[in-house]
């Protein structure tokens, strides 16, 4: 319990640091110029899993590319609010995204149990000069890290309203 509380306090403090104005008055959170911040790619499986890519930019613009087993194939665009983008970045921060391994697949420490024929979700975050990407194989089970990533991926989809293009 004490360890969880300590982790929560550290995560909250780290999040506050991300959103404090810089000394020159410029916002230290979301960059003003349009840069790629978050990506989510859902890959093929043995079946009819939706295959698509999302890119979220610092100005809230969303680019979608539908590939297979989706309602909308090809390109589409959308938009999320600055607040939604900040909340998504906070979700990445809360799970210590930059500290997680680049690949979670059968045989790795974070994949104690693995099943075949599942899709992967590949996420990335570019934030405050750092960039990290994680290939999360959805056939992996048995680790809290997996559930945290799955929830993060679902929150990205929800913020963007990906269902408008995939269902």
Where are these regions (language model features)?
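Short, well-ordered, aromatic-rich surface patches in folded extracellular/luminal domains
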Residues: 2-6, 22-46, 52, 70-72, ...
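Beta-turn initiation residues at beta-strand->coil junctions
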Residues: 64-67
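Structural signal for glycine-centered tight turns and loop->strand junctions in beta-sheet-rich domains
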Residues: 58-62
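Bacterial N-terminal signal peptides
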Residues: 9-18
